[in-house]
Amino acid sequence: MIYDFFMTWLFPLLIIVGKTLLLLVILLLLVAYLLYADRKIWAAVQLRRGPNVVGPWGLLQSFADLIKFVVKEPIIPAGANKGVFLLAPFVSATLALSTWAVIPVNEGWAVANINVGLLYILAISSLEVYGVIMGGWASNSKYPFLGALRSAAQMVSYEVSIGFVLVTVILVSGSLDLTTIVQKQSHGMGTALGLPFNSFLDWNWLVLFPMFIIFFISALAETNRPPFDLVEAESELVAGHMVEYSSTPYMLFFLGEYVAIVLMCALTTILFLGGWLPPLDVWWLNWVPGIIWFVLKVCFVFFWFAMVKAFVPRYRYDQLMRLGWKVFLPLSLAMVVITAAFLKYTGFA
């Protein structure tokens, strides 16, 4: 009886908890070092050294910042709604972390391998704006509230375009399962053109290149990265919805923001860059574990996130709205129609 209970209920539960904790630790380490890389790239563009004191070459700077945030005293404004004020950063961080449950970092390596993973990510990422709105409203200050309103408008504007991009990927791959989407990219445009072996030309970035560009730019807007950081807009709103936050609550907002950025880099990798597939189907590249290729591609996409931050000036609010509704929405909708018609009349899939 006890053995059956252990094997039927307790053992599978322990496996899920173990997978979740392992993913959480790896994800937090990846966020810490991508934040370090972001600061280093930003410093290099400005001809500075960046973090270089804590640990060798400054590699422990993110952990020093973590300790600094944790030991600080959290300050709650007198007029704030205390319950909502403290709940908002937990909502933001929890929703950002929960999306990673369905991300496959290698063949069969996912906490929950569900066949509607793409729909799950779209649904959860749409809810992340609530943490920002709660924080802005509960602060009882006009500057956080303005940042929260900008966030709501920005999320609505670019969520639609991202949705149409995902529709084109679903049409090409024929599945909402992220693992299947990656596997379909092993035989794509390059194979159709008669290349002798599978390569990066088979991935969706080539056949869906306009949607690849739209998704990348929309991901910047979705995660409030420059040049679309109108939620924070440091030169205008001081710190946007986080202006009244300090200590651990501020760190949780910051964590949620960077986890969402890494998620968008991972989604770009899965949808358009072949996930864990090597760039060439040759034995000496197939020998490298798939998770290594996945992490390298995520870091590559994040590098371009950082470069855009360094070189592109911030858009005005009206330019942001115009780009979302008058450019990206018609283009993405047209690409959905073109892709569907192409698949219907050619039978290519």
Swiss-Prot record:
Its EC number is 7.1.1.-. It catalyses: a quinone + NADH + 5 H(+)(in) = a quinol + NAD(+) + 4 H(+)(out). The keyword Ribosomal protein does not apply. GO terms for biological process: aerobic respiration. It is found in: Cell inner membrane. The chain crosses the membrane at residues 11-31, 83-103, 116-136, 162-182, 200-220, 252-272, 288-308, 323-343. One of its GO terms (molecular function) is NADH dehydrogenase activity. It is a multi-pass membrane protein. GO terms for cellular component: plasma membrane. Its main location: membrane. It holds the Pfam family NADHdh. Keywords: Cell inner membrane, Cell membrane, Membrane, NAD, Quinone, Translocase, Transmembrane, Transmembrane helix, Ubiquinone. NDH-1 is composed of 14 different subunits. Subunits NuoA, H, J, K, L, M, N constitute the membrane sector of the complex. NDH-1 shuttles electrons from NADH, via FMN and iron-sulfur (Fe-S) centers, to quinones in the respiratory chain. The immediate electron acceptor for the enzyme in this species is believed to be ubiquinone. Couples the redox reaction to proton translocation (for every two electrons transferred, four hydrogen ions are translocated across the cytoplasmic membrane), and thus conserves the redox energy in a proton gradient. This subunit may bind ubiquinone. Belongs to the complex I subunit 1 family. HAMAP family: NDH1_NuoH (MF_01350). NCBIfam families: PRK06076.1-2 (NF004741), PRK06076.1-6 (NF004745). This is NADH-quinone oxidoreductase subunit H. It comes from Bartonella henselae (strain ATCC 49882 / DSM 28221 / CCUG 30454 / Houston 1) (Rochalimaea henselae).
